[in-house]
């Protein structure tokens, strides 16, 4: 008991999920993002508090960061960020899975609609974790990236440094959804009409999903 099993490797030694006793199977495991560094003064303030907390004058809160980089939560309270600050970021298992069927009829017409959905789970958007490089196409989300002129965003600056591309809550999204599964619209011709052509019953319908 108590052994942790990492899984969900996305490359570069990064595991997305963790399994351990007393927790949901393969819950998402990473850093919790609490903001974006806005300027050097803010970074200096975090570093000074880290130094005071540890008694090490050279201690940084996070290594290799600049304005526009993600700020991670100091979960274990030691004053600076290490791998020990990773935490449970949510489960991929839905809390509820269900469906809903609705049907109605009127003067020979009938309509059936089925919905399907699940709720309460998380998904990990690995596509967003890919590090930006000059040889790749830019994802559209980078249009809203942090710049001094665009500080009110949660998309970090564009950089080759790996700090922003750690497994973190930034890439964990809601997996809840409701979708229209099937629709069927039909019409049953009156029996008085069908008797004239020696047909007992006739129904035409259109369906889609």
Question: Each predicted region: which residue ranges?
Answer:
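Outer-membrane beta-barrel domain signature
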Residues: 87-91, 171-174
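Hydrophobic, lipid-facing positions within transmembrane beta-strands of outer-membrane proteins
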Residues: 96-102, 109, 180-185
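Outer-membrane beta-barrel pore domains and translocons
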Residues: 1, 105, 116-118, 207-209
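Conserved small-residue
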Residues: 1-90
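Extracytoplasmic gating/loop element in the C-terminal half of outer-membrane beta-barrel translocons
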Residues: 67, 118-207
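Repeated loop/turn-to-beta-strand initiation elements of outer-membrane beta-barrel proteins
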Residues: 108-113, 192-193
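Flexible loop/turn segments at secondary-structure boundaries
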Residues: 1, 110-112, 119-123
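C-terminal beta-signal and terminal closure region of outer-membrane beta-barrel proteins
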Residues: 13-43, 140-154, 163-167, 196, ...
């Amino acid at each position: 008991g108590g052994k942790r099993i990492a899984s969900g490797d996305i490359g570069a030694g990064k595991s997305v999920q963790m399994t351990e006793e007393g927790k949901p199977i393969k819950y998402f495991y990473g850093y919790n993002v609490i903001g974006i560094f806005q300027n050097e003064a803010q970074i200096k303030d975090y570093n000074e508090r880290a130094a005071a907390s540890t008694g090490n004058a050279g201690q940084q809160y996070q290594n290799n960061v600049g304005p526009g980089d993600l700020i991670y939560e100091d979960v274990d309270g030691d004053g600076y960020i290490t791998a020990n600050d990773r935490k449970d970021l949510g489960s991929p298992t839905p809390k509820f899975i269900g469906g809903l069927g609705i049907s109605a009829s009127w003067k020979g017409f009938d309509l059936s609609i089925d919905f399907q959905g699940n709720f309460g789970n998380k998904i990990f958007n690995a596509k967003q974790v890919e590090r930006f490089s000059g040889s790749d196409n830019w994802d559209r989300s980078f249009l809203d990236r942090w710049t001094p002129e665009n500080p009110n965003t949660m998309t970090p600056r564009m950089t080759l440094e790996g700090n922003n591309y750690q497994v973190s809550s930034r890439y964990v999204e809601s997996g809840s959804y409701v979708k229209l599964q099937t629709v069927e619209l039909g019409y049953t011709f009156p029996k008085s009409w069908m008797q004239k052509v020696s047909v007992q019953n006739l129904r035409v319908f259109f369906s889609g999903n």
